[in-house]
Amino acid sequence: MYTNSKQLSIDHTIFAWSNQKGLNPIHVEKAKGVYLYDEKGKKYIDFSSQLMNVNVGHGREEVTEAVRKQMENLSYVCPPFTTDSRGRLGKKLAEITPNNLNKTFFTLGGAESNENAIILARLYSNKHKIITHYRSYHGATIGTITAGGDPRKNEVDSQQVPNCVHVENPYYYRCPWYSSSPEECGERAINNLEKTILYEGPKNIAAILMEGESGSSGCIKYPPLYLKKVDTLCKKYDILLIIDEVMSGFCRTGKWFGYEHHDIKPDIISIAKGITSGYIPLGGIIVSDEIVNTFNDKALPLGLTYSSHSVACAAALAVIDIYEKENLIENTVKIGKYTDELMDKLIEQHPSIGDWRNTGMLGCLELVKNRKTKEPMAPFNADPSEMKIMNKVTAKLRELGMFTYSKWNFIFVAPPLIAKKEEIEEGIEIISKAISIADEFCY
């Protein structure tokens, strides 16, 4: 049965970001806690919470029950109607964000959230340009893939959506300005950002869009005060600050949202992933009162058929309840520190580890061929011929019973926030065995 289902999936569905020929996906029969199980009963530890979204772990009966109850009572009404789950979730989000962010427009996921954040920023400001980082990912719609710096956008549309401007990240490990400290790298990045603002014209710039904490671009840690200074520039030049919390939100970094590490107050926050822990698609933009109030006497031209879906909102309420009752913010801090300790030991054992970057439980190993030269095990935007070593590493991870997200020379470590110390130990032991393959290519 399951073998047939796997083949049906290959024959009749399209796989994202993949060659459609030669696929051999894991066929998942069930999942529980931090583990997946295939059709043969093989267990895989999920070390990236799928795509950094299954924060409360797999198979939570509380979420299933909340969804069941909501569907028995009311499955769907269109966005002009109100529902209990919609109202309660909106109120809860207002409680866990700054006191000037009181209303949420609900979407179905992260890309839609960022797309609508950009649209809203342009509508409110009557300006058109958006500034983002080169090394960033904000979604794969035609607007968000352009806004992000992911080079795969060039295959989608060489023209791209106009008026998106990119700046260098304060990526200290590979600092574009060859800085001698994270602080210096951050200061030079701020200087570069301000010059870009002046070149592009503050009167033309609607918003700066940045992640609360860097995610799939390699968990590039912001230097001290960097995001605070970005916020200062936004206020100086009357530019909105949109913070993308799709991946870093909902306890993933040891706080409700990643931006809380940086003492800033965004104008718009984009959310998705952890809001429902992936159980049902849901996203949103949490918007400042100042922006929302400009539409008190004119129609807001945003809309989605499934916005404020009652079942998705019920799932989100159940997930947020788990975050609070199980103190997952505290657990994330504790397990994140323990992971850092284990990684310090791993670095001593493996010359292929160039850098380890982590905030809470959003971490990434960067593999290199030489620590001194920092030659990557696979380059930025690597083509298939340049991925041979990393493909061997990821194949070994799978063989040893691990699923985790990897990209270029990055291996991500972002397990569900319910993970225990022994599960972290299990996962890191598997990673250690797999990256021994990469060690053989070091010089």
Annotated model-derived regions:
Residues M1-Y443:
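Conserved N-terminal phosphate-binding loop of PLP-dependent enzymes in the Aspartate aminotransferase
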